[in-house]
């Protein structure tokens, strides 16, 4: 995990995929491009998620539950 944006979303009644898509849309509106990676707590990510060919969703123990770490494009 390098530089990025931390997103908090505690809407437990909303599908995790939809929550991540909302975070990605905000990230794109703020920075002008989609994040390269989205890290989530392994407890939140029960199954692998396929979103698009640009953003990889990966588990990481360093991310707190209900948070998403959206990583900037590496140079």
Name every feature range the model reports, one short phrase each.
Residues 52-75:
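C-terminal edge-of-domain segments
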Residues 29-34, 52:
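Short secondary-structure junctions
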Residues 3, 34-37, 66-67:
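Short, surface-exposed beta-edge/turn micro-motifs
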Residues 44-46, 56:
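Short, basic interhelical loop/turn and adjoining N-cap
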Residues 10, 40-43, 72:
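Short beta-strand-to-loop capping motifs
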Residues 36-39, 46:
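Amphipathic, hydrophobic secondary-structure cores in small proteins
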């Amino acid at each position: 995990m390098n530089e990025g944006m931390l997103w908090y979303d505690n809407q437990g009644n909303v599908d995790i995929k939809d929550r991540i898509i909302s975070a990605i849309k905000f990230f794109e509106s703020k920075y002008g491009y989609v994040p390269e990676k989205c890290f989530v707590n392994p407890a939140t990510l029960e199954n692998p998620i396929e979103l698009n060919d640009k953003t990889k969703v990966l588990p990481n123990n360093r991310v707190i539950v209900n948070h998403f770490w959206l990583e900037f494009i590496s140079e």
